[in-house]
Design a protein with these regions (language model features):
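A general structural motif
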Residues: 84-88, 117-121, 147-149, 172, ...
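Catalytic core of bacterial c-di-GMP phosphodiesterases, primarily the EAL and HD-GYP domains
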Residues: 31, 62-137, 213
């Protein structure tokens, strides 16, 4: 299994940030969902879907969230100049980090490291798992995050098991719909009416509502009619994704040393069902000679 040092020596930067734009239908403003691309000699490139799974569901959640936020806040001053149309950079976060209080600690550390960063440009995106938690505790934690200047969002809203009416209990800036909502929207006229009413309900709460990828003009038109504010740019569309090497760390050596010097925090794991195969991406061990990106076959 290749070590971080071997990966860097091959000319590959192990971990970089990429941006996936969220396009508004009625304005030039944009949001940007950010994610880490993990490059491994053995595993290849672990992109957006895999990263979101790791960040939400495995024991790497704390480690990746901390690294993600720190790297993002370091480059935000430059991004604000280069891409003024983007009002928020969104970071996916596992709901249990909010409940445990670890997320607040991560944000405080990031602000202390980069006080020149614009907290108001960063949005914390929680999965809809948060709706199954104690809403009083969740609301208190989210209000604390917002008091620090950060925005908040929730994703995967509207799937079969999502308690959608609990969304009204949380302070949110953005809501990202589950793909199941789009399937219902495109099924028939009745589906379009139902989805339109659902989106209207969410917007009455004071949030902006965004859809997953819209791959064709018919879907985009239906989303507009339903009152959706915009949609996520396709992750496979080159024009919507900023290449990783444009906003990579200063040097590959620095990145490798950062990874080698840090040990993942794994206290968020409560049972073995959450450590799916992708949690084998242990990106921080004792030193650069032994740190691995990837696990045993």
């Amino acid at each position: 299994m290749a070590t971080v040092q071997q990966t860097v020596e091959s000319g590959i930067i192990p971990i970089v940030i990429e941006l996936n734009d969220v396009v508004f239908f009625e304005s030039s403003e944009r949001l940007s969902r950010t994610f880490l691309t993990i490059n491994s000699l053995d595993l290849g490139v672990l992109g957006y879907p895999q990263y979101r799974f790791v960040a939400h569901r495995t024991k790497q959640a704390y480690h990746l969230t901390e690294r993600h936020l720190t790297k993002l806040m370091r480059i935000i001053p430059a991004l604000v100049v280069d891409r003024p149309e983007i009002s928020s950079y969104i970071v996916p976060v596992y709901a249990r980090l909010l409940k445990s209080g670890e997320l607040v600690d991560i944000l405080l550390k990031a602000l202390a490291l980069y006080p020149e960063a614009y907290a108001g440009r960063v949005c914390i995106e929680l999965s809809c798992d948060v709706l199954f938690e104690d809403l009083d505790e969740v609301r208190e934690a989210m209000e604390q995050i917002r008091s620090m200047g950060f925005k908040t969002a929730i994703s995967e809203v509207g799937d079969t098991f999502c308690p959608v009416f609990r969304v009204a209990e949380l302070p949110l800036d953005y809501v990202f719909l589950d793909p199941a909502v789009i399937t219902r929207l495109m099924a028939d006229d009745a589906g379009e009416r139902v989805v339109g009413s659902f989106i209207s309900y969410l917007k009455d709460l004071g949030t902006l509502v965004f859809a997953p990828d819209a791959y064709d003009e018919a879907t985009t038109a239906a989303l507009r009619r339903a009152g959706c504010d915009g949609c996520v740019g396709s992750i496979v569309s080159g024009e919507d994704v900023v290449p990783a090497d444009e906003i990579a760390d200063e040097t590959a050596d620095e990145t490798a040393q950062e990874i080698a010097d840090e040990t993942p925090v794994e206290e968020t794991v409560e049972d073995s069902t959450e450590t799916a195969p992708l949690d084998e991406i242990t990106v921080g061990e004792a030193d650069a000679d032994t740190a691995e990106i990837g696990g045993d076959d």
